[in-house]
Amino acid sequence: MRIYKQTNKQIDMKNKLLAIIASTGLVASASAVKVNDNLSINGFIDGSYQHVDNSLLSAAGDSTPAGSPESTTDQSLGLDEVELNFIYNHGPVSGTISLDGYDSFNTGNGLANPGDRVEVEQAHITYSLDNGVSFTLGKYGSALGFEREDPQGLYTFSRAYGGSSANSFNLGHIDVNVVEGLTVAYSADAYSIAASFENNEDVDGEEDELNLEISFAYTGIDNVNLGGGYFFDNQGNSELETDVLNLHASTSFGKLFLAAEYIELSRGNSVGDGSDLDGYMVLADYDINNKLGVALRVSSNEMDANADYEKVTIAPNYAITENLGAIVEFSDVENNNNDGNEMAIELTYTF
């Protein structure tokens, strides 16, 4: 069992969901180094070995020497991501700055400009009132999606959705879905709601109207967590808009944790082939003992009206120490009728 991926999720799921919704992207971690009464630092180092056997690789044709048999296998070994988070709290004011470095060639994270990069992943300040209302301003990720940002937000190594529409379905993947905006949130004992007025990073707000994301979380039923919301895409040309509906639920029975998610993309006529797309995920995670656990995930997402991406993943995980965890993942993938197998070994150190 990965301490920071499973035990914290099962014991503190309610608090985490409320915090995520209310603050829209606060960094989660198993521990933090306290610098003084107001400032703490946490982060992680994540690396992996990956092996892919997929007939789609031979279709690329750019990595196989002329005259050689087309290769359908690929492998990589390296440092995936390093993150350092500075968290400030003083009375009603809190703030987070997340510095992120990653190798997007090794992680395959869908970035437009792949390669080694170091950047400010998140930077936001929050002002909280005594009545449960809070205001967050800055750069942050979406509050939608069951799977969250960074290794701590996943029960597996890989993300559920893939193919050409992966970035649209992996809502919580902050490396590809980050915005700049203002969130107004309200948090009560059993529920929270939030409205984020936002634009994509580095987009001029004068070019189109602000996008709007409405999110919610409900924890009023014992051992049950409900969440989701709706993203309203407001562009200058409505034919280019993609609205997003997200619903997810989770529950636990002793050592067994279950979750399910549904996502629907309503696309304008000029987006792809103009068809609406949907995807789903079902996850089961079982703690065998205090150190060993296993996750099973089944997921599917449409890439266009005639092509689907389907994935079955099994991921045993082991807590080597309180701060060092390992995952061995095996996935069977069908990408538009092309079959493939993926294997990964991941090590993550948190501090």
Descriptions of predicted regions:
Residues 46-50, 100-102, 140-142, 196-200, ...:
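Outer-membrane beta-barrel pore domains and translocons
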Residues 2-33:
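Gram-negative bacterial Sec-dependent N-terminal signal peptides
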Residues 33-57, 66-200, 208-210, 217-223, ...:
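Outer membrane beta-barrel
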Residues 83-85, 123-126, 183-185, 215-217, ...:
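Outer-membrane beta-barrel architecture
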Residues 188-192, 207-209, 214-305:
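Detector for outer-membrane/organellar transmembrane beta-barrel domains
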Residues 41-45, 95-97, 135, 193-195, ...:
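Transmembrane beta-strands of outer-membrane beta-barrel proteins
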Residues 318-320, 339-351:
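Outer-membrane beta-barrel "beta-signal"
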